[in-house]
Amino acid sequence: MKIISVVGYKKTGKTTLVENLVCALKNCGSVGTIKHLHEHNINTPGTDTWKHASAGADVVIGVTQCELVKFSRENNLTKALDELADTGVDFGVVEGFKESKLPKIALGNVEAINILKRLNKPDSADIEDIINIILEQPEYHTLNSLLAKIRRYRDIEKSGAIGTFTGIVRAAEKETRTEFLEFEEYSDVARQKMNEICRELKQKEGIIDVLMHHKTGIILKGEDIVYIVVAATHREQLFPVLREAIERLKAQVPIWKKEHTQSGEFWVHDTNNI
């Protein structure tokens, strides 16, 4: 999923621009949106869903004849992005969250980081130019988004098994307590190398498709680092390739790790550390 955020002060035309982007992006793939609602409460007090939540339900799902609505106490941007990515959409358009690190299209004189383009008003937007900017953004993936992608592959009907690997940040090893890891990559080279590994592994007998995604930046203890998904005709062909994909990613892809522990921080290069 490629992400863009539209930011601006109130009444600057954010929703109008989001509408225009959604319409244009539909020509490129599936689209989902996220809206920052500030203090607005969707779960209206007194309704049955509100009563469920008030009684202590952590997640409430309401189903009507034309909608499915989920109410959750995990109300932060990362959870919203993961939820959107899990559906398998190709693009995520976010309205608001100007304090985030997301790539942004800014309306008016709003101050924010990572602004890729600034507009005076939505009707002055070159939509084609903005679409090209969005297409250049890195992919945001969850394990479920990769599973959704591999299930859409044209030859998936030949598959009898899908295997996955998820590497997470280990919090404790012997006497060492890790608080978080920090990953840096060699720009587009890392993605190119992962694509090369996937292409080569797909040539093996019985392998339908191979996908992998490695996160960068700061990742807290217990959080996901890397996902690998393999589809194969039979499990006997799947497991050796899944293991080879893990080992080759660790050995060949230019991604570097700094470990932040309770006793200090240091760079690590260890192919056995996932």
Regions inferred by a protein language model and the residue ranges of each:
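N-terminal, polar/charged subdomain of small-to-medium soluble alpha/beta proteins
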Residues: 2-7, 12, 38, 54, ...
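Short, ordered loop/turn segments at secondary-structure junctions
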Residues: 11, 22, 36-39, 65-66, ...
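Walker A/P-loop
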Residues: 15
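N-terminal phosphate/diphosphate-binding loop that engages ATP/GTP or pyrophosphate donors
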Residues: 22-73, 83
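Short, high-confidence coil segments that cap the C-terminus of an alpha-helix
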Residues: 28-29, 57, 86-92, 207, ...
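Glycine-rich phosphate-binding loop used to anchor ATP phosphates in small-molecule kinases
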Residues: 68-108
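Short phosphate-coordinating micro-motif centered on Lys-Gly-acidic
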Residues: 100-135
